């Protein structure tokens, strides 16, 4: 991935370097997922893995981090759109109507607009990197509880991923554009098998 046009603030770069050398936790709070954020996270994880002689894992982890972070941000955007359109996340019919609206609205420009709305609403995505020589924990979460319907869909995706032998099989059998496609879960499962 090439470096983004917009540079990161120097304070963020310095904090990441300090974290890398002290093996402390790094927490990144974002309201969307733009190219500068992606570049920063991929570069940081590459440096962490290089430090512990595991650079071969960097491309796969970079994809997984991007997939899960984008899904967490999209969940926030979806909730904002639902609120704007008076959609009840607990009502299955209303939820399906909201998902149709969301699929129609999702775009790069929508992501920029809703990233600003997410910031105004204090809906963020925290990506935490916690590591030392023995382990690497990456936690990606938004600050919005899932509805019962959303949780059920996530659990179905986990079950589908567990039944598939590889990413290609999963993609052919389980393409579902209503939420995230479930690729992050499948990427993680595949990485666990191959490490």
Question: Where does each model-flagged region fall?
Answer:
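Short N-terminal amphipathic alpha-helices
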Residues: 56-62, 72, 76-81
């Amino acid at each position: 991935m090439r470096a983004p046009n917009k540079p990161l603030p120097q304070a963020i770069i310095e904090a990441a370097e300090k974290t890398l050398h002290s093996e402390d936790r790094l927490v990144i709070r974002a309201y969307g997922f733009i190219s500068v954020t992606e570049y920063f996270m991929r570069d940081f994880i590459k440096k962490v893995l290089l430090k512990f002689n595991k650079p071969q894992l960097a491309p796969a982890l970079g994809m997984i981090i991007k997939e899960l972070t984008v899904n967490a941000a999209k969940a926030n955007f979806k909730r904002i759109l639902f609120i704007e359109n008076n959609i009840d996340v607990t009502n299955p019919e209303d939820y399906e109507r909201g998902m149709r609206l969301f699929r129609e609205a999702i775009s790069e420009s929508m992501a920029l607009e809703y990233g600003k709305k997410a910031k105004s609403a204090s809906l963020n995505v925290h990506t935490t990197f916690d590591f030392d020589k023995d382990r690497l924990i990456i936690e990606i979460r938004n600050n919005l509880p899932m509805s019962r319907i959303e949780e059920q869909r996530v659990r179905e995706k986990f079950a589908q991923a567990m039944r598939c032998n590889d990413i290609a099989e999963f993609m052919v059998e389980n393409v579902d554009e209503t939420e995230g496609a479930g690729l992050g879960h499948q990427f993680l499962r595949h990485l666990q098998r191959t490490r």
